[in-house]
């Protein structure tokens, strides 16, 4: 059963009050960064500066894909340096490959499943040395992998799936979630939710099936509906999904009910050039998502590190209330 629920607007409280401790976990979601690199890298730099400055208040950073615009060595080197700064600040992070990060050569967006450039600059050999490393689907790349996080008294498992994950990748992810019933699960992926707050289902032109990715292997690629049906719906401990990719308004929110009755809170956030009202490649907007087991709330705020202000719209700052966190782990 899929349903869009009313989201209650929250006046923008200060992030400084969201220090992670006890029963509170604070994660930052970095939406598509691609157009910063070709238009205004200084705005992206402001995001990294802000993350480093607030490192003691952040449990992890999740980037939702399209790190680059053209999948070029220059862009990848820039992103590698940026995430090295985040890592050196002691902040756990994960990244996923978007359609602009995959392709036969720079500027060919997911025409084939070639992630060589991404994995050259974000190699598994480096990433698996991190204390929060979980595992990789193929044991060779960061195409599909998971990490483990401990925040306060909560254990988290974060699945990171590439643009248009294959059936094999979903089968692997299904097995990983299945053997960790004691952890709250978040999915971080690129293409999942549409801007009308519905799942990608093969009918919209942003769907992974509209690209060449996977065709050279004759393999199935999955959109949001496929990921939901084959993976997320099946597990009680899945609580949230973060994604990007889609333009128009660039935002969407959906709450779906899993097989075991658990609510899954799914959020699309994208501010890149091409999104309605976008300026400066995205104006440095990022999402601050706080899971508060004490108040039973998920608090979402959207903050511009460039403007040093929260987004003025209620569609970007809201709360999910009456979240029974304990129910996910029974």
What do these predicted regions represent?
Residues 22, 170, 180-238:
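Active-site-proximal segments of metal-dependent phosphoesterases and phosphodiesterases across multiple
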Residues 29-31, 59-66, 92-99, 161, ...:
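Active-site neighborhood of phospho(di)ester-bond hydrolases with catalytic His/Asp-centered motifs
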């Amino acid at each position: 059963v899929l349903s869009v629920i009313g989201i209650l607007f929250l006046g923008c409280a200060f992030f400084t009050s969201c220090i992670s401790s006890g029963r509170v976990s604070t994660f930052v979601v970095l939406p598509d960064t691609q157009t910063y690199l070709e238009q205004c890298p200084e705005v992206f730099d402001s995001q990294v500066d802000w993350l480093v400055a607030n490192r003691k208040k952040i449990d992890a950073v999740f980037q939702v894909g399209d790190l680059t615009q053209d999948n070029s060595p220059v862009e990848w080197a820039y992103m590698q340096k940026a995430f090295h700064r985040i890592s050196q600040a002691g902040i756990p992070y994960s990244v996923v490959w978007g359609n602009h990060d995959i392709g036969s050569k720079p500027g060919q967006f997911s025409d084939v499943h070639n992630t060589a450039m991404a994995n050259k600059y974000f190699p598994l050999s480096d990433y698996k040395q991190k204390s929060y490393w979980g595992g990789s689907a193929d044991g060779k790349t960061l195409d599909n992998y998971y990490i483990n996080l401990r925040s306060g008294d909560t254990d988290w498992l974060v699945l990171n799936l590439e643009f248009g994950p294959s059936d094999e990748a979903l089968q692997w992810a299904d097995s990983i979630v299945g053997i960790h019933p004691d952890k709250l699960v978040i999915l971080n992926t690129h293409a999942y939710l549409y801007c009308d707050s519905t799942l990608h289902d093969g009918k919209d032109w942003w769907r992974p099936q509209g690209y060449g990715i996977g065709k050279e292997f004759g393999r199935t690629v999955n959109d949001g509906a496929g990921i939901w049906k084959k993976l997320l719906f099946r597990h009680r401990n899945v609580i949230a999904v973060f994604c990007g990719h889609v333009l128009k308004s660039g935002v969407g929110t959906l709450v779906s009910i899993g097989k075991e009755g658990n609510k899954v809170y799914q959020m699309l956030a994208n501010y890149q050039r091409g999104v309605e009202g976008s300026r400066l490649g995205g104006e440095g907007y990022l999402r601050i998502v706080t899971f508060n087991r004490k108040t039973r709330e998920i608090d979402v705020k959207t903050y511009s590190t460039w403007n040093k202000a929260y987004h003025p719209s209620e569609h970007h700052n809201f709360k999910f209330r009456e979240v029974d966190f304990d129910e996910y782990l029974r």
